[in-house]
Amino acid sequence: DLTCTLYSFTGKPTQVKQVHTVPGKETITEVRQHTYDHADRLLRTSYQLNTDAPVTLVDHVYDELGRLKSDRRNGNGKLRSDYAYNVRSWMKSVSGPLFSQTLNYQESMAGTILCYNGNISSMSWKAGSETTDRGYRFTYDGLSRLKDATYGEGNDLTTNPNRFNEQITGYDKMGNILKLKRYGQISSAAYGLVDDLSLTYNGNQLLAAKDIATSGVYGNGTDFKDGANQTTEYTYDKNGNLIKDLNKNISSIGYNCLNLPDQVIFGNGNSILYDYGADGTKLRTVHTTGSTTLTTDYCGNAVYENGVLKMLLNEAGYVSFPDKKY
């Protein structure tokens, strides 16, 4: 690859041109244009692929205090987000057509213990065209460690309560979680306990996780899969790297001289292999599942799967191939 960069007098990159070449394949040229305001804050990034028309990846607007006020991606109004802050410049809300979220600190809400130290006392969100808020109320112990996340819906989070609660019922003296309960959907019309975990440690290293919950999560939800019942389910090397995870059926994890994982071997024979450059940059991943092998190569911001260009990564996401969609 060849990369050429133009800079402003203050050292900010104003144009970056990348030429990506692979023998026998089409040459790809990417050009990024960066625009800044009087305070050298990024205002806009445009992107041109080969001879296609340039597109705007990101637009930034700042308030009088220099905080990000809004951004828009790909020039699409639906991908706009507006940001609001309180008087302490703590994030208060993110709002947009596709997702909105509100964070509360000392603001009053039914059943909420107000927080004046920066802890979030409650949060709520809506996605897409949803009209009902979903959210959590949080409680903490005397060391500001999370104790309870209580789920609810509606303006005061009192509708459909407790469906997706999480409870941490104990910490050890070093702050490690000893017991954790998670609730979720257990059938088409019922909600209940899906995880009841007890965690044991050797110092700060997790040794085992035992789940005594009798119900599994329903549908496409996720819960902890207790794949082993051993005294030691997680094993580490002398550098503290995890080398075995019985709950995930990982029989071996190998590391290179940079302490980066270079192979993961599963008990069923499946494997993941990683290759890196001398600086630790990941260059290749090889997933082997049964008789199927998927090789992913990382060439700068270009990602190939089995030798075919899959995507080009950029500041706003990626360009997929061969359809060239942003």
Sequence positions of predicted segments:
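A residue-level detector for well-ordered beta-strand positions
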Residues: 4-5, 34, 60, 81-83, ...
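Structural signature of Gram-negative outer-membrane beta-barrels, strongest in the C-terminal barrel
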Residues: 25-93, 163
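Outer-membrane beta-barrel transmembrane domain signature of Gram-negative proteins
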Residues: 2-46, 218, 222-227
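Short, ordered secondary-structure scaffold segments
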Residues: 1, 101-134, 200-248, 293-326
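Short secondary-structure transition motifs
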Residues: 87-95, 173-175, 179-204, 254-326
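Short, small/polar residue-rich loop motifs at catalytic or cofactor-binding pockets
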Residues: 1-2, 28-30, 53-56, 77-79, ...
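Beta-turn initiation residues at beta-strand->coil junctions
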Residues: 1, 5-7, 15-23, 44-51, ...
